């Protein structure tokens, strides 16, 4: 690779990024092509990327694969990793685990952490090789030691749930914290939940709030919900119902069902906001229509009691049945009582027994 090739590549990158010049993908491609004529692996890779993404040219997976392979064959580990990925997906090339493994291993042997992660995934899933969590963990360990946050999270989560390894909360916390400190929201969320639940650590709502807040700021919906829940019902030092309502609205409006259920409860009880049964009904209906059993149960009770809606035993029974069919024990007990007393439905002791028995079964699990 000549100095001229490197200069051509750098000029191409300047045009690609708009660095010191007006951004121009056509100019970038021109200079990448000139560098590629001198077998510059990164320039060849960038040509592949431009065809892959349709940047400054028509998207062409086959043409992208051609350039990625050329770059990979010149030993560029980033290209080797991408070639492994396109063989997994069958994008521009015939799908094949054997070829994917070949290229992931080449990049992994150069300590390219993303390839080590992907190679570990192949072993974890048994794609093209016998399933082997020990080998997966070995490759992930190499990547994690290099600071790859995605792999650090994967290892932390494995130790947290005991998947492929014996549960080890100390190691889970170690790897999750390393990934969380690099800003990975999934790691921040799980670390926050360890502190919220006291899983392998001294329970600390303050610490939980800190990590959940970081993930929530990156729009991680489960973190927004759990932070809202913590502020809604956590210990005195973190409880802030009005802030909980603000947070829950953020995730509820984006379709997060558990947020919709909890937000409905805030409106129904008037906690952190003015009591508003219509808003409770609105959010519970959103979640119930999406199949959430808790919301279906809440709507059923609303209709039975006539709070926020006109009293309607048939509509109440319909929602309770939807929830009960999903194994919601409170809904099953409620149906059992309705059928045994004949309240809102014709008395039917067989149905009463069936629903109460179902509730007892689910509670015994």
Which residues does each PLM region occupy?
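Short helix-capping/linker turns of helical repeat alpha-solenoids
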Residues: 2-4, 8, 17-19, 24, ...
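Hydrophobic face of amphipathic alpha-helices that form TPR/SEL1-like repeat modules
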Residues: 10-17, 46-53, 82-89, 118-125, ...
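Leucine-rich solenoid repeat scaffolds
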Residues: 333-336, 346-365
């Amino acid at each position: 690779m000549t100095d001229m090739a490197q200069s051509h590549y750098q000029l191409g990158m300047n045009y690609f990024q708009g660095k010191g010049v007006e951004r121009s993908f056509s100019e970038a491609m021109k200079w990448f092509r000139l560098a590629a004529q001198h077998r510059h692996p990164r320039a060849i890779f960038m040509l592949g990327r431009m065809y892959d993404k349709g940047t400054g040219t028509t998207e062409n997976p086959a043409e992208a694969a051609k350039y990625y392979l050329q770059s990979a064959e010149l030993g560029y580990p980033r290209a080797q990793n991408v070639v492994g990925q396109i063989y997994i997906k069958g994008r521009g090339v015939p799908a094949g685990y054997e070829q994917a493994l070949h290229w992931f291993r080449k990049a992994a042997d150069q300590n390219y952490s993303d390839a080590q992660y992907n190679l570990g995934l192949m072993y974890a899933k048994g794609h093209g090789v016998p399933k082997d969590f020990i080998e997966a963990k070995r490759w992930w360990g190499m990547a994690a030691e290099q600071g790859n946050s995605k792999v650090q999270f994967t290892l932390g989560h494995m130790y947290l749930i005991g998947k492929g390894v014996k549960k080890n909360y100390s190691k889970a916390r170690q790897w999750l914290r390393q990934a969380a400190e690099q800003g990975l929201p999934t790691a921040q969320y799980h670390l926050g939940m360890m502190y919220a639940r006291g899983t392998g650590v001294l329970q600390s709502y303050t610490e939980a709030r800190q990590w959940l807040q970081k993930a929530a700021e990156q729009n991680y919906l489960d973190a927004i919900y759990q932070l809202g829940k913590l502020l809604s019902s956590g210990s005195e030092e973190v409880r802030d119902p009005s802030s909980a309502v603000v947070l829950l609205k953020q995730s509820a409006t984006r379709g997060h069902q558990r947020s919709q259920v909890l937000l409905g409860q805030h409106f129904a009880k008037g906690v952190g906001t003015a009591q508003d049964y219509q808003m409770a009904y609105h959010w519970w209906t959103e979640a119930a229509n999406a199949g959430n059993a808790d919301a279906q149960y809440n709507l059923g009770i609303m209709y039975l009691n006539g709070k926020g809606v006109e009293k309607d035993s048939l509509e109440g029974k319909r929602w309770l049945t939807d929830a009960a069919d999903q194994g919601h024990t409170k809904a099953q007990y409620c149906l059992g009582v309705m059928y045994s007393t004949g309240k809102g439905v014709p008395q039917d002791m067989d149905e009463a027994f069936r629903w109460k028995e179902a509730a007892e079964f689910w509670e015994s699990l």
